[in-house]
């Protein structure tokens, strides 16, 4: 008879090796591929950091804000700004900043599960979530190169951890701890509400989910929702933080003359609605890298098939399972998180279909919530059934990881390497333009940003 503890440790060692390997792969991709996958958004933030460095102003006068308004001390922008004092290489500063933010995200994933699960299996939960997040899909550019959407997950995790401690029944026994927790909650919700996107997909769904859970807890008696001092205080602080954040955002946008805001988002007409729906479905498959015009019997074809299975589990099976499974519970944090995530996902999908905000990048928050649901779903299967189910789950994850990273090396890293070799041998377009004094006349505004940074 095989030893159960030995089999258990082998399974966990295999999963641990896959997680560590995935983390090292992400570090390599960030350091090696960022320059090859550089785009105008990254150029904008680096140019802003350079202007901040030279002017000594966090919001330089006359700077053209096209991608967004950075918030002091709570974005990777401040890390790049500080690194510029010791490093002159713009892109390297950006890469180091993204590595720091990514490490912070991984740490918060572990802290989140240790807080809400509080058992040894929290490490297993964190490992599976990190493993799924590191799978090479179309979310990579926004997550690990631009770093634009990592902060959404970071702020959500911080908010959930603080909220969990606030809702613990023992929290009001220590007055100082209570004040600090509510102050932390106010600050986090305030800064989230200073971004219209975060207000719509995080702050508002969060407060709405809290009120809905409270409504259920009092057996659907509306007049009893605010019967406790904690509920009244929590609601007042929440709406105050959201309102102040909303006002502060527009005040800041006006101060820096932001060229475009989410206020420019409009509803689409009936003639465009069906096209938006088709675009949304296409974006979902694209985001999970579940579509590709390639041979079925190739590493890319196999990876595409595996990604389709992941899409089905992540986007359909696990969210529905979570709603059914945790919806039956009463007063649990995971029930609250499920309701919050469903409301947030619904709003994102609604805006992607019924408004002009149909870019695939908006799907990132839905993708993130589905990773959490998938982790909980897989752990449930592993715990409910015998060890052989655990072996099947871990082996499937490891196969997906190996195929995904191998395909990424072939389809993305290899062409970037060829690009670097060609640039080393033949020079770059920027070098040619500078050698011939052609410093103006770039093809477009975005290319001007891109080329200027890459020429540094």
Where are these regions (language model features)?
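Membrane-proximal lumenal/periplasmic loop motifs of glycosylation machinery
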Residues: 32-40, 53-81, 91-92
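Short periplasmic/luminal acceptor-recognition loop of GT-C membrane glycosyltransferases, typified by
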Residues: 434-456
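Transmembrane-helix motifs of polytopic, lipid-linked glycan transferases
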Residues: 20-24, 96-120, 158, 316-321
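Membrane-interface alpha helices of multi-pass inner-membrane proteins
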Residues: 177-207, 240, 244
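Hydrophobic/aromatic-rich transmembrane helices and adjacent perimembrane loops
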Residues: 148-155, 201, 302-314, 334-386
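Membrane-interface micro-motifs in multi-pass membrane enzymes
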Residues: 69, 73, 120-167, 358-370, ...
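Hydrophobic, aromatic-rich transmembrane alpha-helices
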Residues: 210-215, 300-332
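Signature aromatic-anchored transmembrane alpha helix within multi-pass, membrane-resident enzymes
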Residues: 11-22, 176, 180-184, 236-240, ...
């Amino acid at each position: 008879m095989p030893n159960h503890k030995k089999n258990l440790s082998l399974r966990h060692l295999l999963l641990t090796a896959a997680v560590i390997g995935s983390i090292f792969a992400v570090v390599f991709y960030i350091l090696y591929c960022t320059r090859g996958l550089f785009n105008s958004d990254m150029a904008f933030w680096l140019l802003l950091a350079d202007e901040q460095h030279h002017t000594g102003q966090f919001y330089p006068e006359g700077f053209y804000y096209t991608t967004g308004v950075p918030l002091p001390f709570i974005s990777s922008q401040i890390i790049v700004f500080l690194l510029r004092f010791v490093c002159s290489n713009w892109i390297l500063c950006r890469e180091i900043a993204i590595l720091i933010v990514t490490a912070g995200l991984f740490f918060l994933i572990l802290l989140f599960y240790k807080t809400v699960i509080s058992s040894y299996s929290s490490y297993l939960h964190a490992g599976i979530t990190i493993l799924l997040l590191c799978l090479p899909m179309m979310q990579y550019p926004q997550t690990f190169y631009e770093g634009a959407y990592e902060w959404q997950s970071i702020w959500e995790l911080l908010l959930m951890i603080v909220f969990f401690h606030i809702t613990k029944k023992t929290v009001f026994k220590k007055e100082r701890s209570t004040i600090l927790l509510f102050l932390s909650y106010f600050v986090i919700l305030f800064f989230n509400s200073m971004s219209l996107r975060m207000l719509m997909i995080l702050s508002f769904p969060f407060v709405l989910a809290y009120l809905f859970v409270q409504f259920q807890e009092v057996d659907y008696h509306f007049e009893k929702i605010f019967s406790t001092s904690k509920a009244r205080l929590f609601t007042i602080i929440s709406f105050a933080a959201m309102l102040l954040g909303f006002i502060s955002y527009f005040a800041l946008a006006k101060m820096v003359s932001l060229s475009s805001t989410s206020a420019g988002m409009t509803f689409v007409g009936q003639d465009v609605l069906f096209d938006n729906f088709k675009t949304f479905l296409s974006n979902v498959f694209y985001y999970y890298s579940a579509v590709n015009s390639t041979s079925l019997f190739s590493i890319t074809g196999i990876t595409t098939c595996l990604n389709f299975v992941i899409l089905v589990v992540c986007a359909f099976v696990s969210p529905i399972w979570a709603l059914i499974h945790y919806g039956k519970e009463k007063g649990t944090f995971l029930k609250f998180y499920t309701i919050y995530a469903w409301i947030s996902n619904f709003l994102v999908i609604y805006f992607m279909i019924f408004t002009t905000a149909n870019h695939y990048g908006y799907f990132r928050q839905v993708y993130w919530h589905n990773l959490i649901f998938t982790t909980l779903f897989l752990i449930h299967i592993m715990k409910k059934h015998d060890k052989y189910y655990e072996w099947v789950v871990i082996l499937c994850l490891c196969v997906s990881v190996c195929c995904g990273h191998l395909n990424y090396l072939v389809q993305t890293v290899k062409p970037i390497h060829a690009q670097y070799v060609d640039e080393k041998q033949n020079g770059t377009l920027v070098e040619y333009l500078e050698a011939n004094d052609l410093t103006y006349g770039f093809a477009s505004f975005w290319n001007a940003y891109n080329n200027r940074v890459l020429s540094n």
